[in-house]
Amino acid sequence: EAIDVVPCETIDIEVPARSEFIIEGQFLPNRDITIGPHSNPIGYYDDEQLFPLMEVQCITHRDEPIWYSTMEMMPPFDHNYMAVLPIEGELLSDLQTKIPEVNDVVVTPNLSYFVQLSVDGAQKPHPEFGKYVLHAVWGASGRWGRTAKIVVVVGPDVNPYDLNEVEWAILTRVQPQSDTIINQSGQAFLMDPSAPKDSSHG
């Protein structure tokens, strides 16, 4: 169904008539502004950064508009929960096309990745199947797999949405020397303050 559109006030384009706000303006070449320091979604402050300057010419809105905004702070908060949804969907879709035994993917507000399988230890295709899934996460299309810092693979009896259950499974089913992998070729998440300064970022 088509949506109603209306013309802008200062620009020759049409916009959805029921938009909360329409901000009209222009970006001028070689006009930047310094922003920061400011908080980011992982609980740290970013340094000052240069961004293109937008000259606002007009602001219009519908009746009783709602202004959407987030306050960046220590996770968890609303930005984190909104941000992980597309990551979960992207990874789940990619993994299930390659590994039918992948049942679900959960990404926590702190960007830990929990992958739930539909098979338990007795049913898995081969003894190292969990590690195979780990490598599939790091090799997934898009940038989120290769920047995954912590990935945990659990069986069908562990609820990946319950951090206590995941921690219990790690405590009772994992031996670090044989059941963990350090990904030496992984990329650092762009905002990770612990990443080496010369590392590649995703």
Where are these regions (language model features)?
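Charged, compositionally biased interaction regions
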Residues: 1-202
